[in-house]
């Protein structure tokens, strides 16, 4: 019998979030970003919940092939492009749109005998300073590619480094506008934060990532109420032991939690080997048990953690414990753990059960 530590993935929540995004950016097509196994939610869940997307954006070629093998016939974007010249065979075979962000990729394209023309997203480094061509080299490369019969279409792609900052976005947009006046390209610019905070960046295509999964990239009560995004992932486990602890006792490894009163505690079968963050405080991190919000006490262990049951009189062996989801925000946990919700979702262990609903 497997351990009960489980992530539940709501395909209905995924579909709802996509509808919300499409309604908000209703003049743009949508690349649903499902890199890193759909931010830990699984490609299978993405296919089920995001059927109405315009296309899927992935990182690795094997994710793109998996989409095709599971029946997706629409557009697929390879966000970092190809890594080897040999990758171009599958890009052509599976009709995948590739990013080009560097001269070495450009040279591979020129050298490779491409039988069927491919779609290319040319990456502009407008200020992120990670991937892409600078302004001058971008224009040169654009003209270079546009003269190749093996290229069927070109799109300008860029990425905002601080999507909620008007100053930063405008600085990058000024560079993009200069190039737009020269080339008049199709544009793909806005990531999740820019989609929400800067509607003028929406253009032809948008690339929502974290917001598809019900998480705002920056906490904002007004925005949260406006969008009403639904959490897609719930991490839950079960109580496997209940202990009555006398006053003036330590709980768990390292004597990190001292109780000066009698305590009813529950041992939950989830730990850092499952992906729950070890770095949360020794008290105060919320969990949800039988309709009651309570807290973790003591250190998170490899396979278990301890919770306070003093205010949960109905808790028993086998009671469900929500660690994040509809009742406990993953953003709240990530702040307490001094990390991000992105990291928490992506680092769920392979030993955790996945249930797609």
Curated annotation (Swiss-Prot):
Q: Catalytic positions?
A: 35 (proton acceptor), 253 (proton acceptor)
Q: Which GO terms describe its molecular function?
A: alanine racemase activity; pyridoxal phosphate binding
Annotated residues for binding of substrate = 130, 302
Q: Which Enzyme Commission numbers does its entry carry?
A: 5.1.1.1
Q: Catalytic activity annotated for this protein?
A: L-alanine = D-alanine
Give the keywords, sorted.
Answer: Isomerase, Pyridoxal phosphate
Where on the chain is N6-(pyridoxal phosphate)lysine found, per UniProt? 35
User: Pathway, per UniProt?
Assistant: Amino-acid biosynthesis; D-alanine biosynthesis; D-alanine from L-alanine: step 1/1
What Gene Ontology cellular component terms go with this record? cytosol
Regarding protein family, the annotation reads: Belongs to the alanine racemase family.
Q: What is this protein called?
A: Alanine racemase
To which species is this protein native? Wigglesworthia glossinidia brevipalpis
**What high-level taxonomic lineage is stated for the organism?**
Bacteria, Pseudomonadati, Pseudomonadota, Gammaproteobacteria, Enterobacterales
């Amino acid at each position: 019998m497997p351990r009960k530590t489980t992530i539940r993935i709501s395909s209905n929540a995924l579909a709802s979030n996509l509808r919300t995004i499409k309604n908000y950016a209703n003049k743009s097509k949508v690349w649903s970003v499902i890199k890193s196994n759909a931010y830990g939610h699984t490609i299978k869940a993405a296919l089920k919940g995001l059927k109405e997307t315009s296309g899927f954006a992935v990182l690795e070629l094997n994710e793109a092939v998996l989409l095709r093998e599971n029946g997706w016939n629409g557009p697929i974007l390879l966000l970092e492009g190809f890594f080897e010249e040999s990758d171009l065979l599958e890009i052509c075979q599976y009709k995948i749109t590739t990013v080009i962000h560097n001269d070495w990729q450009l040279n591979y394209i020129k050298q490779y005998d491409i039988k069927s023309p491919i779609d290319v997203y040319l990456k502009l480094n407008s200020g992120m300073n990670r991937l892409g061509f600078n302004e001058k080299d971008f224009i040169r490369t654009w003209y270079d590619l546009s003269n190749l019969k093996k290229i069927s279409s070109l799109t300008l792609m860029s990425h905002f480094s601080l999507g909620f900052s008007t100053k930063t976005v405008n600085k990058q947009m000024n560079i993009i506008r200069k190039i737009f006046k020269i080339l008049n390209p199709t544009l793909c610019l806005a990531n999740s934060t820019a989609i929400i905070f800067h509607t003028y960046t929406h253009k032809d295509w948008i690339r929502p990532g974290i917001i598809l999964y019900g998480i705002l990239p920056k906490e904002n009560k007004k925005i949260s109420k406006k969008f009403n995004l639904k959490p897609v992932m719930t991490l839950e486990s079960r109580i496997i032991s209940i202990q009555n602890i006398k006053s003036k006792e330590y709980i768990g490894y390292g004597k990190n939690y001292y109780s000066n009163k009698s305590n009813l505690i529950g041992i939950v079968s989830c730990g850092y080997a499952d992906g729950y963050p070890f770095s949360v405080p020794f008290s105060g991190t919320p969990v949800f048990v039988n309709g009651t919000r309570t807290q973790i006490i003591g250190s998170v262990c490899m396979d278990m953690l301890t919770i306070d049951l003093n205010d949960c009189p109905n808790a028993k062996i086998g009671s469900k414990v929500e660690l994040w989801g509809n009742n406990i925000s993953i953003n709240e946990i990530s702040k307490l753990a001094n990390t991000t919700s992105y990291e928490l979702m992506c680092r769920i262990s392979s030993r955790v059960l996945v249930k797609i609903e």
